[in-house]
Amino acid sequence: MSFQPSSYIVTLDEVRSKIEACVSDINEWMTDNKLKLNNDKTELLILHAHHRPSPSLDSVYADTELIKASESVKNIGVWFDKTLLMKKHVNSVCKTAFYQLRHLATIRRFLSYQHFEILIHAFVTSRLDYCNSLLSGLPQNLLQKLQYVQNAAARLLSFTQKTEHITPILKELHWLPVAVRIEFKILVLVFKAYHGIAPHYISDMITKYEPTRSLRSSSKRLLVVPRHNLKTYGRRAFSVSGPMLWNSLLNNIRETETLSTFKKQIKTFLFKRSF
């Protein structure tokens, strides 16, 4: 549920009552359908911009159980914090990935390059790529933490020292940097949405650019970039970042009809831009 700042629209008591009413409706629906709401797993997360003070709403009631607000919650393997800066998620990914790298390092000399690369992608790269479209627009210092993980994996795979520059290594491995991999994921989602092969809740977030009169840009398959505020929040939204990245592609890439060909073309495009 979303609310405007309490001073403009509603008081915190009204916000609390609306949330509790929503939970009550959910509980009633579940009861009618022979289900039960697990209050022990019910969590409350109050989201707010990092430049605004935290709302004083600290708890609500779910039936008779008092649910206190959490600093962060985990959903489908991703940690969300109250300012959506994803700090806990980034730190969790880095901790787990470095743990896996330390263990993989003990068996590196026993495996061939091809077999060890498979392990790197299975235990490390998969963690960096999981839900990484949510990391779009994060501060550079957070993305750099994830880049350190990829750099360490590249050095371990290629038997190179920390003193050697990482860019030639990533280029030789043909690995896109972490920030660019995020762009790759978003562009794939935009392609699916544009061609109607994405879920409706994703497709509904993009709008094709259709000028009212005939223009040269009419045939370029551009998307509308919504008006937005704040680089740290508005521009991070898929409805904004997706069209911006899509419109920056070359015309021949946007005109691609198949997903497999599109993936190859944007990887080549992003790789050349990165290196």
Segments and roles (model prediction):
Residues M1-F275:
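Hydrophobic/basic alpha-helical segments
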